[in-house]
Amino acid sequence: SIKFGLFDIGPAEPELRCKGVLDEQEKAPRIVVTDPSGKQLFEKRRSCDETTDHGLLADIFSWVDDYLEADPLVAVGHRVVHGGRDFSSPIALDERTITALDALTPLAPLHQPRCLAPVRAVQSLRPGLAQIACFDTAFHHGLTPPASRFAIPRSLEERGIRRYGFHGLSFEYVADRLTTLAPTQTRMVIAHLGNGASLCALQNGKSADTTMGLTPLDGLVMGTRCGTIDPGILLYLMQEEKMTVDEVQHLLYDGSGLLGVSGVSADMRTLLTSREPAAREAIELFTFRVAAEVAVMANTMAGLDGLIFTGGIGEHAAEIRQQICDRLAWLGVRLDPAANAKGAARIAAPGSLVDVLVVPTNEEMSIARHCRRLLVAGP
């Protein structure tokens, strides 16, 4: 599925006009568009045999043209997962840059092609429309050794095998919100917890460390991704279990994480209501790993002033927040149970040595802001 937002990018902050979801995974692919209040503005379904080469994307453009009337669409901004070494900030897309981004596919084999497919589709449907790529790796581009380094031969590092980090558009948005919500706190850990999950050590507003590495497979336990594991497991699977590279890739990306451990679901909501012991064990492993990595991030910054929860699980799963914070009591983290249950913005108990906040993320707004800056700056 593809999520999208339509923004006015007038003289100040971009303003959301509507948002939608394009879902081509269902038996009847569909688009649903709503206004910021949630009121439905448009819905269209197609049978699979009606779907064109570009699916429902052409339908979105047609609807947007009617919706905007005389106010033309000026650009499309894309979230691109991997920018590699060379792309440290948003860029205007052309054939050269698209080719360069496609070459990074081995670093994000499942994500990068899905990011670039809409770029190619827009290029075909609206060849004159400006397209802008915003990178999930860019927020972490300032990482320096040791946080950016693997313990591998330096010759490999010189060829780009290093820790890049991801979820940067989410971390960027939350970091901007924290300048208002917690302006005096300089050592924060942002926990983006969803189907994909990672942490960022935010020191003086900049990324100082993060849990994902070369690829989005690294770090925390995720919905279907394994996170950090002993690399020797990969050798064992190939040498002793005779698994192919493709089989190992599928196992690590699509068959591990919460789904693999629980055998029930990759969805935390399902696991929280399940009576299966393995579901509870998957949750326990998830919270154990998050808490352990929060401690690592605190070590990077030599302390911890605040812990921020965001992402689908981080924003909505009070029980998960409680379990993580209980594991961090030794760091002085204390939750207010009532505030946590309500999903309040601030959920730390009086006397907690660490501030704890829930901050909804907005990656679409980060993209809209970058698009506006590039369009205003011009070529």
Residue ranges and their predicted role:
Residues S62-V74, L178-A182, V294-D305:
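Phosphate/pyrophosphate-binding loops at sites that engage ATP/ADP/AMP, CoA/4′-phosphopantetheine
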Residues I60-H111, A130-I132, A138-R149:
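Short beta-strand-loop/turn "lid" adjacent to the catalytic site in phosphate-handling enzymes
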Residues D305-L328:
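Glycine-rich phosphate-binding loops at beta-strand->alpha-helix junctions
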Residues H250, G257-V261, M268-T300:
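Adenine-nucleotide phosphate-binding core of ATP-dependent small-molecule kinases
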